[in-house]
């Protein structure tokens, strides 16, 4: 599905040896102020295995309002991102199970997940399409 001019250009280039993943998923995994790093690393490994690769941004900071005290808290968060071509029901269950295990091990009440398009394009095709 072409959403805008950038999507049109990227999908055109992807036809010449690139890849277009119709979806990407991002998981925002708090590190419990670095006390549950093992749980976050395990989640990252599971996502990498399930999706065939992932990117992690380790320098993010997440904030939330403590509902009891009304105070804004912040802590380090790993943003784990992976592209995919639609999961099978079994793969989707495996992903949900990985999220559940992380949440349990890290003692998280909530885990943020988002989804959208993601392109992987060959540089050579990009260079040919946009010669200066």
Model-identified regions with their sequence ranges:
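Positively charged, small/polar-rich N-terminal and surface patches that mediate targeting and assembly
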Residues: 2-132
């Amino acid at each position: 599905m072409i959403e805008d001019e950038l999507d049109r250009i990227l999908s055109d280039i992807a036809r010449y040896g690139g890849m277009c993943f119709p979806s990407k998923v991002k998981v925002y995994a708090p590190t419990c102020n670095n006390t549950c790093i093992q749980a976050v690393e395990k989640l990252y490994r599971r996502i990498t295995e399930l999706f065939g690769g992932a990117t992690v941004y380790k320098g993010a900071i997440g904030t939330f309002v403590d509902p009891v005290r009304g105070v804004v808290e912040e802590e380090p968060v790993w943003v784990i991102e992976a592209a995919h071509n639609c999961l099978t029901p079994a793969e989707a269950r495996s992903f949900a199970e990985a999220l559940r295990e992380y949440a349990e091990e890290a003692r998280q009440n909530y885990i943020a997940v988002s989804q959208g398009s993601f392109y992987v394009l060959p540089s050579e095709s990009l260079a040919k399409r946009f010669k200066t």
